[in-house]
Amino acid sequence: MPRPITRRGLLASVIHAAGVAMLAAGSGCTAKGSLQALREEVQALQGARVVVPPLPGFRDLRGVIHTHSYLSSDSDGRPEEFLTGAQQAKLDYLVITDHFDPRIFIEGLNGQYGDLTVIHGAEFPLGCTRKRGLARRCASILGFGFGPSIVPTFSPDAYSKPELIAQIKRHGGLVFLGHARGVSDPQYFGMVHGMEVFNIADTMREQYLSFPEFMVDLFVTQQEYHEELLLSVIERPNWLLARWDRLTRAGHRVVGIGGNDAHQNLSVLGVLVDPYGLVYRILNTHVLVDVQGSESPAPPSTQVLLAALRQGRCYLAFSLLCDASGFQFYAADPRSGRPVAMMGAVWEHVPCPQLVVRLPRVGAIEIIKNGVPEFRTVGRELEYTPSGPGVYRVEAFLKLQRRWRSWIISNPIYLLPGC
């Protein structure tokens, strides 16, 4: 049975046709020398990285949320392919969110695979904006981590969207809004644990007009600079961050995550544009799991990982620029320096804490309060005295080709008026 034509399929066709036309016309392309210079600059960024001593009692896990397999209608990815991709990207966990199909309960991977924790879930449609064509935006519900009480006979169509969200949560699952720019009814933001504040597939779709040039460069360089060309995907998600800040400023505890939305299905001119191993390295959601009282080097349990995500003890990082493992943002007692609140936590006690930031390499550090940049400096560490109660988060940037590029986006710490 032929698959339906999707926006992603249409995009691939447009790119393919444009790429062929440009090649036939002998169009110019980015010189290998420029891409080599870019590679050397990125290598210099990565070479300056240092190991940040971990916070006692916590472990930083690097992972990917929102990936698809052959159990989705728009991907042919096999388990061995995304497990290999996870190994290439040095992931600690992988959340699979196939478009809902009862087979995910039978055939879908779930559990421990060596050092990799795999958590199965599903993606459910949430409707689209009224626009048509490539400008149309469609949101989704990402549900994962639900227990065995949701059985293969579970039918999402039997519920309204609010009831579906409640059902997933009732069975122990986490619920996030995917493709959050497509959410047409703001009530959903108050029903879920969090939202994607970056989605790779959406960003690639928004940049589709520049893709023919991308594909020609990829083709003529024989894929030698695939990583360097995909650095163009890394952009600060201004609209989504502004939406997220409005929600948290209004008192909603909304956890921000990254959505890789990996399909490994975009092949143009015989070249696979989005292999799992590469898409898993562009963006990672790091989770700080609580391992206090445990000396075991074994991977923390799925429940411990999900608990940290639920609390918002996590941050996003564009790892293709530089590995951000070891990043720290916490509130500390100004007298002892002891951490008193981690990302996602609420603090309302006296005295008001200091905010501490540590990076694994020098970068621009920006303190954002209630959605507004309040302080910026360049360095590897920062101890900052907040100006008063508010919702504080951190963004970090790395300079590449004379421009500051988004690197790290933290979840907020909520300082209440009581402090």
Question: What is the meaning of each model-derived region?
Answer:
Residues 27-28:
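C-terminal motif of bacterial Sec signal peptides marking the signal peptidase cleavage site
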Residues 31-60, 72, 79, 250-256, ...:
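C-terminal functional module detector
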Residues 33-221, 234-243, 250, 254, ...:
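A metal-dependent hydrolase metal-coordination microenvironment
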